[in-house]
Amino acid sequence: MALIEPFRALRYDPSRVSIPQVVTQPYDKITPEMQDRYYAASPHNLVRVILGKQQSSDHAGENTYTRASQFFRDWRRQGIFLQDTQPALYLYVQRFTAPGGTAELERRGIIALGRIEDYSAGVVFRHEQTLAKPKADRLELLRSTRAHFGQLFMLYSDPAGEIDGLLKPGCDPDMDLRDQYGVWQRVWKLSDPSVIELVRSKMRDKKLIIADGHHRYETALAYRNERQAAGAGQTASTPRERSSSSASGQPGAQGPAPHDLVMMTLVNMDGPGLVILPTHRVVHGLQSFSSAEFRAGASVYFSVEEVDSSVDAARATVILREAGRIGTALLAVTPDRVFLLDRPKPVDPSFFTGWSLRQQALDVVQLHNCLLEGVLGISEEAVREQKNVRYIRDIGEAMAQVRSGAANLAFLMNPARMAQVRDIALAGEVLPQKSTDFYPKLLTGLTIYALE
């Protein structure tokens, strides 16, 4: 049972700041160069809170987390943020053209508070593993600020589009901007109690899959457990108690405590605007590499066909798409040759120990087991720590790194299909690292959920 609640969001006051100058991409997509640009854009850019710069004088009493807390408190006191007076859901619409595409697409989501559930409850499902260090970082920020600044990207299934059909704002958006990638981002506040209750009712039988935000979800889960262990509020035990919080818009009155909830954007996985981009693998730092030896090794696992070595990014994309219609297909770009690898050959089942048949059907599992480890000898640990593998979204950049001599070879990929992600997640399984890249990302700072 997916339980969602409206809330009184904190939002930037557009009379005090320029919204495009203060919102950001998700914290884990912010490069050092982007961080510098965000700092320069506005003294109130949210990067100072979600990913502040470290200073050489930092110590336990003053550091990025204490500064984040101070910025957040100061901006609230100064009126940089305003809290909505009524509990609401927020319609979030993104219109965009995907990289490499031509069609304009639209993705609609609902910003709401969602009940934090243990994975064992069978309500929220993950599709990737998490790492301890990012979770420790986000937990320290949450403890310091007691607020959620970005939404978790959550997927639900609604083939008939019933929930999207309820979201008809009928007015100009509250927020309207284009981000640095040209994505048109708009937000409407939906405060009609009847619409809110209809959406909540329709969501109750849904299962939720985390698209982006696994580390933040597990951080919120850890924080909830901390607060409950400290006796800071008890979770409501019945649907009636849970729903009562929506009347006042203040979670914790009779329903879930504030720490039982986390901010989410809920997107229909069956909608036309859901895009997953491929993440290409660039291999570097090998002591020796030979195109001929690689081809011989790859031939043990795949049918190998050499293609024109001068192929460009556009043509490579077409080749991959066509070959991928019938199953696994990869392009291996070496300094002097390009190979199409498809039609995987039978291998000893022990080669995929620990992987289900669902997982084995993924191109990325075939790549990691057969090619990275089987042919090139790059261990799972080395892949996880990115010792010999870089992850690149742009296919042209991946090819250029090889042709410039900066890398040994690149593996160009097709994206994972949503059906694969869904089936693996609902089975309680996970995909390898960097298997999905949902596009576009959700902006951070459009709405903020303050726990106190």
Q: What is each PLM-predicted segment?
A:
Residues 1-452:
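Surface-exposed, charge/polar-rich loops and edge strands
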